[in-house]
Amino acid sequence: MIRRRRFGRAEVRIPAIGLGCYNLTADRGVDRDTALATLQRAYELGVRFFDTAPMYGDGECDELLGLAFGHLGADEVLIGAKLSGPPGERFGDYRRESVLRVFDRTLRALRRDDVFALQVHGFASPRDIPRQTAEWRALYEPGMAFEALLELKEQGACRYVGATNHNSVLLAEAVRHFPLDVVEIASHYNITSHVAPLTLLPLTEERGVATVIANPIGGGRLVSLETYRAATYLGAVPLDEAVGILERLMRDTGLALYELALLYLLHDPRVTCVIPGPRNVAELEADVGVADRPALSDEQAAELARIGSRMLARKVPTESDVEVVGVPLRPEWLATTT
């Protein structure tokens, strides 16, 4: 059974394992029958939080959730939707009028009048921190996405508002600027990256902001030791040492690497929900199955935390990089790669 956790400062608890739905679209090579069967099985297994966005499959992800759950009430299925410009434009037209038009299409596709959570959809430019920062901060301006987000909450189109990004420092900045209820971070918190626990989670804990972890299996690199070795390595310890830690913990616990990855995040009480992205029923059942596994010990979680990179992007951050995102440089962020 999936245990529930409090959704930030709200008086509501949600299952700690949700579903990232992008991988169920044709963009990711999944046919509609498989996608709908996976969504239905997820609901049967106790998953209630479903993450979607207009960008996912050019609106197909929203449509799938509408087909699967449009007949269910707002308390039966918790939709985590995104506020963005037209699909395919990344940081394209995020003006208020544009994102409101796109959100209207989202509601029609979902077959709903409102959603559980609505988040400004941020994208990463991991090799260009100044550009990413400028694009993100433009959304703070009057007449842009964050203004529209808060208006929609006032109108009752969503219960909770938030933001998503691959850069946890920029998410922390948004939490300081706006009365957000939830953030969703990808890339900066999993076994391969330990940036969000340093930059974002202390703030979300302090302010009672729910924290959703996307990409918990590191874009597939944490499925197995084979995929881990094959991926570009950016850890805080030498690769051989990291593999040794993983091999030992897998042997001691009897867990697969993807199970370690999910349980590592669930060990952190500041994490509200993790949203793996399975492509079929078998992968879904494997992901949700970790709910029945014993929790990691503090010592085991600490061993895994040693592996994760402290880098803000795919390079060691420089003084100028950190100055751009408006936070003081910390020595632990300067981990070298091997």
Residue ranges and their predicted role:
Residues M1-L78:
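N-terminal binding-site loop/beta-alpha segment at the start of enzyme catalytic domains
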Residues A109-R131:
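Active-site groove signature of glycoside hydrolases
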Residues A26-V30, A53-D62, P86-E89, R96, ...:
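Acidic-and-aromatic substrate-binding clefts and catalytic sites of carbohydrate-active enzymes
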Residues R13-I17, G46-R48, G73-V77, R112-F116, ...:
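Short, well-ordered coil/turn segments that N-cap beta-strands
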Residues G29-A42, Y94-A109, H166-E173:
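Short, acidic/polar
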Residues F123-K315, D321-T338:
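Beta/alpha (TIM)-barrel catalytic core signal, keyed to glycine-rich beta->alpha loops juxtaposed to Asp/Glu
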Residues G66-A81, E141-E151:
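Alpha-helix-loop-beta-strand connector modules within alpha/beta enzyme cores
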Residues F7, L19, A35, F50, ...:
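Conserved, mostly hydrophobic/aromatic
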